[in-house]
Regions:
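Hydrophobic alpha-helical positions that pack around
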Residues: 589
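Beta-lactam-recognizing serine transpeptidase/beta-lactamase-like catalytic domain environment
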Residues: 82-85, 90, 229-236, 249, ...
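Periplasmic/cell-envelope proteins involved in peptidoglycan metabolism and beta-lactam response
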Residues: 1-316, 418-425, 540-541, 559, ...
């Protein structure tokens, strides 16, 4: 027994051998190193990938989330006037989880909702949600409420007594979600230029469509979730608001132009036939030294706040009878931007280009003369001048001043088809201008090619018939004729600014090419100045102000209908042009359409107000010219005098061939419209020309 106890004692006092101690030290060292490495790795992940893993964890947990909407950028005019903006509106959100969590919340909350929003909410609908949707935390009861409407409920909910306690603590389970609604302060102003948005802030037409990616931002999001301890936590990702664009349109000039278009339309509504004053009326003003669009307007137009409202043009009965296709066609007719998407035969405003081509190529000399006997012969047919008795001998300048078709046809023979078509291309006809607006028409198939053009086509092209262009093509080419020869890309954008007002980028004018020499440009400018002072365009002049320009009268296709498009292209001041203005009146509602006086009168009435606004001062002695005239030009002139004064090469019956480039396409509704951009406005009816 004693011996056994002695053995146990020896066993208890036995110590670890040295090699075992060494192993333990190594083991614990490795364990400590692993622990340090693990801690280091965790710290590294937290620093570099913390947000990623946080989102992963959140995605596995029970949570609610809501979108925090961005604010779409504004559209501002050149002076900073807001033309389009986004205003906050509010949705009423019902949280049935909270509302039904305590029976005492239900009646006070329902009563408060119905008293504050009697026209927006129905009691039976609210009670149905409470009975059937008790687990839902997000139910939209009403959308698009104003701040003032919402405040009535908020004040009731937060009202306190003298002790600072809530008077209505049992109003629960209701909150307000912020959204943004597009607002257009000037409603109809520049409607086809600005455009509008559809649901989800998607730009549908105009600048809203073209600059959709710039104006739009990125939605934020708020996540609410229960963590492992069942505590409610949330994380917020802030929205990124869209950038704003500043455009070259001047709201004041735009308003003047639109007011005068409306005045003209009213003056001739129900004149010859029941209907508007013209099928289309359009005006573009541009800065010839930059290509900036100063104003762009057309009729018919629409209210940007109610873009699908046709009541201005149709009765309720007519609208009700419309098929879906007819409704779309009617809407697209008012949404279209005539200045950009529509093509037409320009008429005599082409003549300065023919003269410039001849002078620039040396095929026409300044000293050349032409004899106008009233017509040119092409086989069995005669192409007449508007003065069938003939102008007699004409100089180059006189041919422009008198708008002599016969002289221009003779010039085209000297120029030849190859040079003529070459300069059509140099001036940009048949090509897109690249203007920053959607739906620009593609016109390559609407002008002649060298292998297709015949002598009669060259002759009629020389005075603006038998080829098609757009207004923006014509005015962009024209200002290169009078600014020294520089063709600037037409544009709307001036700069982009972020939500804090910082400039993101600035647009600089782009000089694309030289169309004519400065000497040719100076001659054309002089010829057109005399066309206003002593030629066919006198009625456009505002007494005391210098002005140059050219009239246009084009017979529309089909010729047998005897419809006309009349126009005037002008610039001022003569010595140092600050703007170019182009007025087009398509099918005026008058007995005798073939007179440019309608476009001249509209131009003059616009310029009366534009000159003082632009700080352009009188630079000539007053002579009393056009004194007392209104937009109809009736005062001081009878109709016969006006027609004689403004007979600018109007096209006589049967003098223009029926076949034109792209005629088949136009009949099938092709090429006379802008390309099919992904927007509602591109289903417009076929151009009738």
């Amino acid at each position: 027994m004693a011996q056994q106890q002695k053995k146990r004692k020896k066993r208890k006092s036995k110590k670890f051998p040295l090699y075992m101690k060494s192993k333990l030290v190594v083991f614990f060292g490795i364990l400590l190193a692993c622990l340090c490495a693990l801690i280091g790795r965790i710290m590294y992940i937290e620093y570099h990938n913390g947000e990623e893993y946080k989102k992963l964890v959140l995605s596995k947990q029970d949570y609610d989330s809501k979108i925090i909407p961005y604010q779409r950028g504004d559209i501002l005019d050149t002076n900073g006037t807001v033309l389009a903006t986004s205003v906050a509106v509010y949705n009423i959100i019902l949280d049935c989880k909270v509302l039904t969590s305590d029976e005492k919340y239900i009646e006070p909350t329902v009563t408060a909702l119905l008293s504050c929003f009697p026209k927006k909410l129905k009691e039976e609908e609210i009670r149905k949600y409470i009975a059937e949707e008790q687990k839902r935390a997000y139910i939209i009861l009403a959308k698009g409420l104003s701040y003032d409407e919402v405040q009535k409920f908020v004040k009731l909910q937060e009202e306190v007594d003298d002790k600072g306690k809530k008077k209505n603590p049992d109003i629960n389970g209701v909150w307000f979600e912020t959204e943004y609604k597009r607002s257009y302060p000037y409603k109809t102003l520049a409607a086809d230029v600005i455009g509008f948005t559809s649901a989800g802030d998607v730009g549908t037409t105009g600048l809203e469509h073209y600059y959709d990616d710039v104006l739009n931002g990125i939605n934020g999001r708020e996540y609410g979730y229960l963590n492992s301890n069942s505590d409610y936590e949330k994380t917020v990702i802030a929205p990124e608001d869209g950038d704003s664009i500043v455009i070259s349109i001047d709201e004041n000039i735009q308003a003047i132009v639109e007011e005068k278009i409306a005045e003209f339309n009213e003056a001739y509504t129900n004149n010859k036939t029941k209907g508007p004053g013209a099928k289309n009326i359009a005006v573009v003003m541009q800065n010839p030294n930059t290509g900036e669009i100063i104003a762009m307007a057309s009729y018919p137009t629409f209210d940007l706040s109610k873009p699908r409202d046709l009541s201005a043009y149709y009765t309720k009965k007519q609208i009700k009878k419309m098929s879906q296709e007819e409704t779309y066609a009617a809407l697209n007719e008012i949404w279209k931007n005539y200045c950009v998407t529509e093509t037409y035969e320009p008429g005599s405003v082409q003549k300065p280009f023919t003269v410039a081509c001849g002078l620039e190529t040396g095929t026409v000399k300044q000293s050349d003369t032409f004899y106008c006997d009233g017509y040119e012969v092409f086989g069995p047919d005669k192409i007449h001048c508007f003065d069938r008795s003939g102008h007699g001998t004409e100089t180059v300048e006189g041919a422009l001043m008198d708008s002599c078709n016969d002289s221009l046809m003779q010039m085209s023979y000297q120029i030849g088809a190859e040079k003529f078509l070459e300069y059509q291309s140099i001036f940009g006809f048949g090509q897109k201008t690249g203007i920053d607006l959607p739906g620009e028409a593609y016109t390559a198939s609407l002008i002649y090619t060298l292998d297709k053009i015949k002598p009669v086509d060259l002759a009629t092209n020389s005075f603006g018939q038998n080829y098609n262009c757009t207004m923006v093509q014509m005015i962009s080419a024209f200002y290169s004729l009078i600014n020294g020869g520089t063709y600037y890309q037409p544009h709307m954008l001036k700069k982009i600014v972020d939500a804090k007002g910082n400039t993101v980028s600035t647009y600089s004018p782009v000089a694309l090419k030289q169309t004519v020499s400065s000497s040719t440009s100076a001659l054309i400018r002089e010829y057109l100045y005399h066309t206003v002072t002593s030629g066919t365009a006198t009625s456009a002049k505002v007494d005391g102000y210098s002005l140059g320009g050219k009239t246009g009268t084009a017979q529309k296709y089909p010729r047998a209908e005897k419809n006309y498009l009349v126009s005037f292209m002008g610039f001022a001041p003569y010595e140092n042009p600050q703007f170019v203005i182009y007025c087009v009146i398509d099918t005026p509602n008058v007995e005798d359409q073939a007179h440019s006086s309608y476009a001249l009168n509209l131009t003059r009435e616009i310029l009366k107000e534009v000159y003082p606004y632009m700080n352009i001062y009188p630079d000539e002695e007053k002579t009393g010219v056009n004194e007392g005239k209104d937009i109809t030009g009736a005062v001081g002139h009878d109709d016969a005098q006006l027609q004689d004064e403004n007979g600018d090469g109007s096209i006589q019956d049967n003098q223009i061939p029926e076949e034109t480039p792209g005629q088949e396409n136009r009949q099938n509704g092709q090429d006379s419209q802008g390309e099919q951009d992904e927007q509602d406005e591109q289903d417009d009816p076929d151009n009738p020309e």
